[in-house]
Amino acid sequence: MAMKAVCVLKGDGPVQGTIHFEQKASGEPVVLSGQITGLTEGQHGFHVHQYGDNTQGCTSAGPHFNPHSKKHGGPADEERHVGDLGNVTAGKDGVANVSIEDRVISLSGEHSIIGRTMVVHEKQDDLGKGGNEESTKTGNAGSRLACGVIGIAQ
């Protein structure tokens, strides 16, 4: 049975968006689609973070969702956090159209992303290849511009 989820991204500044998630069945890839506005032109890190806690803005969402205790990487890497979805790219108009298919995240089961926080970051994610310790944790993606809790949708 197909599962769907949605996340409304908001922050302290102009960045906002809505991301839809769909997974046709357990073990199938999750397809993300949506749009984020108010970004600066270029790439921005895009991750699922550990907690669905936004009580202190995006900072209370904790680190990247990483139940297997791996180092940070890109979405196609074997060595990556479950929440590592790479980058979204904004055009000159500040809009990023999101279209991602990922086989590591799931909308059900032990490591479901439901109830966790989606975050869009200030800078490009270096996919763990930045050559410093922070790269292996966060991809040097910088501050959290907007976030929202991933919830079950119809």
Curated annotation (Swiss-Prot):
Name the record gives this protein: Superoxide dismutase [Cu-Zn]
UniProt entry keywords in alphabetical sequence: Acetylation, Antioxidant, Copper, Cytoplasm, Disulfide bond, Lipoprotein, Metal-binding, Nucleus, Oxidoreductase, Palmitate, Phosphoprotein, Zinc
Q: How does it assemble?
A: Homodimer; non-disulfide-linked. Heterodimer with SOD1. The heterodimer CCS:SOD1 interacts with SLC31A1; this heterotrimer is Cu(1+)-mediated and its maintenance is regulated through SOD1 activation.
Under SUPFAM superfamilies, the record lists:
Cu,Zn superoxide dismutase-like (SSF49329)
Job description of the protein: Destroys radicals which are normally produced within the cells and which are toxic to biological systems.
UniProt miscellaneous comment: A mouse model of ALS overexpressing human SOD1 variant 'Ala-94' exhibits disease onset at 89 days (males) and 99 days (females). There is a marked suppression of DAO expression and activity in the reticulospinal tract of the spinal cord, but not in the kidney or cerebellum; transgenic mice accumulate D-serine, but not D-alanine or D-aspartate, in their spinal cord. Simultaneous presence of the amyotrophic lateral sclerosis-associated human DAO variant 'Trp-188' potentiates the development of disease.
N6-succinyllysine carried by residues: K4, K10, K92, K123, K137
Record family assignment: Belongs to the Cu-Zn superoxide dismutase family.
**Which residues participate in Cu cation binding?**
H47, H49, H64, H121
Residues carrying lipid (S-palmitoyl cysteine): C7
Q: Which cofactor does it need?
A: Cu cation; Zn(2+)
Where on the chain is Phosphoserine found, per UniProt? S99, S106, S108
Q: What is one Pfam family matched by this protein? A: Sod_Cu
Report the record's Gene Ontology biological process terms.
action potential initiation; anterograde axonal transport; apoptotic process; auditory receptor cell stereocilium organization; cellular response to ATP; cellular response to cadmium ion; cellular response to potassium ion; determination of adult lifespan
Residues recorded as bearing N-acetylalanine in the entry: A2
* Residue numbers binding Zn(2+): H64, H72, H81, D84
Q: Which InterPro entries match?
A: SOD-like_Cu/Zn_dom_sf, SOD_Cu/Zn_/chaperone, SOD_Cu/Zn_BS, SOD_Cu_Zn_dom
The knockout note for this entry states:
40% reduction in hepatic GPX1 activity.
| GO MF entries | copper ion binding; protein homodimerization activity; protein phosphatase 2B binding; protein-folding chaperone binding; small GTPase binding; superoxide dismutase activity; zinc ion binding
